[in-house]
Curated annotation (Swiss-Prot):
InterPro entries: E_motif, Pentatricopeptide_rpt, PPR_At4g14850-like_plant, PROP1-like_PPR_dom, TPR-like_helical_dom_sf
Residue stretches of biased makeup (Basic residues): 21-35
Gene3D superfamilies per record: Tetratricopeptide repeat domain (1.25.40.10)
First-listed, main subcellular location of the protein, grouped into a coarse class: plastid
Transmembrane segments: none
Species: Arabidopsis thaliana (Mouse-ear cress)
Protein name: Pentatricopeptide repeat-containing protein At4g25270, chloroplastic
Length: 527
């Protein structure tokens, strides 16, 4: 493997706390005490991960009458009772099976209880149990706790299992550099990666966004004999697409001998991510021709981005024939499709027929009515349905108020956003308010919103809204201030210069018009 300048993190965690974990477990103190007492020496023996155990059968039988989680809880409670009575629990198969069940159910609290039941010598001497414990913590978002267990595994170099789990845990948390550091540490420790290592580390690489690192890992996986493994190559396609090299992504895609639905969806998503709709539609057609059904995520992405209404209608028909019209993400995308084409009746019909709705559904239908007051009616329905709006919801309703001149409603909603829903205003919300006041001719209020009420430095969208309002209402003084800030923030945006020229033209200030035009010439902008 090749080396890379990614500093391995220093892992020293004296305690488990909210500052050191991505999630705070209920058994904080138990974990802390457990780690202090659990390990005394090293020396592990391997245990087959697939060794049969009676515990799954026990849980399966109990699941007939109770949920799996209740059955798991019952088994652990029985074992805890036995331990309290001094009955020795030494069967590794039981603990391995319980950890497997906790992992499959993502039952981290139950996993902590199992962790407490494992005898210290068994945890020290059984690589299989330690590895499963690492996987459980890592998969549930406790990568740092998993790393503590991992650091005490003396023979962890005998298998990539625990390494893979920890790499995956960091990658899922967005700690991509930590995941990459572990991968390169594997090479230093002489641990041979397997087909499960590469998809995990490629995900981390895609998060970092480095094609150079990705190419190095590509060479590694070919050297290790996985150059034609569809599972690995699918991850490679995603990595190159996320790192910005869609050509390499397509080259890898074309190399896959037996493409599965993940291969096709990965390439389709990659094209959509890069805005290459024509290429995405070609992949979509090829998928259908090859008998591969695009998943609902891919279908939703295509529907939301398709430019031709004819193509959109054809896709809608295709969706109906496959009975997918009322899949939540697909229905949401159809609302966007029809509303963008001005087909509000069809968009409303789909929304009204939906069996379930999420925030995206409400946002889509509210945004569809951004030019009329009906959007506020949907917002009120959303409130009555106890659906929780988000920042996007308020961008839509505030834009609606600006477009329709509903100043008081806009002010009320802006206040409601933070006071009732706890959503802190962001740049786009302030831009909406400036637009609201500006369109209504309330220039002083618009300017005051920027210089007195904003808790952050105004960006181009905010100053741009103010400059446009100055153009609409012929306010030269504030317009000059807004233009000057925009010239500093966006020195190459000729639209800002053109708006100032129009403001001066309205005011019949010919000399200032020529001065701004000369500024454009000096900066190499078109006039």
């Amino acid at each position: 493997m090749v080396s890379i300048v990614v500093h391995k993190p220093s892992f020293s965690y004296p305690s488990v706390s909210s500052s050191s974990m991505k999630k705070k477990p209920r058994h904080h103190q138990q974990l802390k005490q457990h780690r202090q007492n659990q390990y005394n020496n090293n020396g592990f023996t391997s245990l087959s991960f697939t060794k049969p155990s009676p515990t799954p059968l026990l849980i399966e039988k109990q699941s007939i009458h109770r949920t799996q989680l209740e059955a798991l809880d019952s088994v652990i409670t029985d074992l805890e009772t036995s331990a309290q009575k001094g009955i020795s629990l030494t069967e590794p198969e039981i603990f391995a099976s319980l950890l497997e069940t906790c992992y499959s159910l993502r039952a981290i609290d139950h996993g902590v209880r199992v962790h407490h039941l494992i005898p210290p010598y068994l945890l020290r001497n059984n690589l299989g149990i330690s590895s499963k414990l690492v996987r459980l913590y890592a998969s549930c978002g406790y990568a740092e706790v998993a790393h503590e267990v991992f650091d005490r595994m003396s023979k962890r170099d005998s298998s990539p299992f625990a390494w893979n789990s920890l790499i995956s845990g960091y990658a899922e948390l967005g700690q991509y550099e930590d995941a990459m550091a572990l991968y390169f540490q594997m090479a230093e420790d002489g641990v041979k990666p397997d087909r499960f290592t590469f998809p995990r580390v490629l995900k981390a690489c895609g998060g970092i966004g480095s094609v150079q690192i990705g190419e190095a890992i590509h060479r590694d996986l070919v050297k290790e004999g996985f150059g034609y493994d569809v599972y690995v190559l699918n991850a490679l396609v995603v990595m190159y697409a996320k790192c910005g090299d869609i050509v390499k992504a397509r080259n890898v895609f074309d190399m896959i001998p037996h493409k599965d639905y993940v291969s096709w969806n990965s390439m389709l998503t990659g094209y959509l991510h890069h805005g290459l709709l024509h290429e995405a539609l070609d992949i979509f057609r090829l998928m259908v021709q090859n008998g591969i059904e695009p998943d609902k995520v891919a279908i939703s992405s295509v529907l939301a981005r398709v430019l031709s209404f004819k193509h959109g209608r054809q896709l809608h028909g295709w969706v109906i024939r496959r009975g997918m019209e009322w899949e939540l993400s697909v229905a949401n995308a159809l609302i966007v499709l029809y509303s963008k084409r001005g087909q509000l009746g069809q968009a409303c019909f789909i929304f009204d027929q939906m069996l379930e709705r999420d925030t995206v559904s409400w946002n889509a239908i509210i945004s569809a009515h951004s030019k009329n007051s009906n959007g506020l009616k949907y917002f009120e329905q959303m409130h009555r349905a106890n659906a929780k709006p988000d920042g996007i919801t308020f961008v839509s309703v505030l834009s609606l108020c600006a477009n329709t001149g509903m100043v008081e409603d806009g002010e009320r909603l802006f206040s409601l956003m933070s006071k009732e829903y706890g959503i802190d205003p962001k740049m786009e919300h302030y831009a909406c308010m400036v637009n609201l006041y500006g369109r209504a001719g309330m220039m002083e209020e618009a300017y005051s919103m920027i210089v007195q009420e904003m808790g952050l430095e105004a960006g181009p969208t905010v100053w741009g809204a103010l400059l446009y309002a100055c153009y609409l209402h012929g306010n030269t003084d504030i317009g000059e201030v807004a233009a000057q800030r925009l010239f500093e923030l966006e020195p190459d945006n000729e639209h800002n210069f053109e708006l100032l020229i129009r403001i001066y033209s309205k005011a019949k200030r010919a000399e200032d018009v020529e001065r701004v035009r000369q500024m454009m010439v000096d900066r190499g902008l078109e006039t």
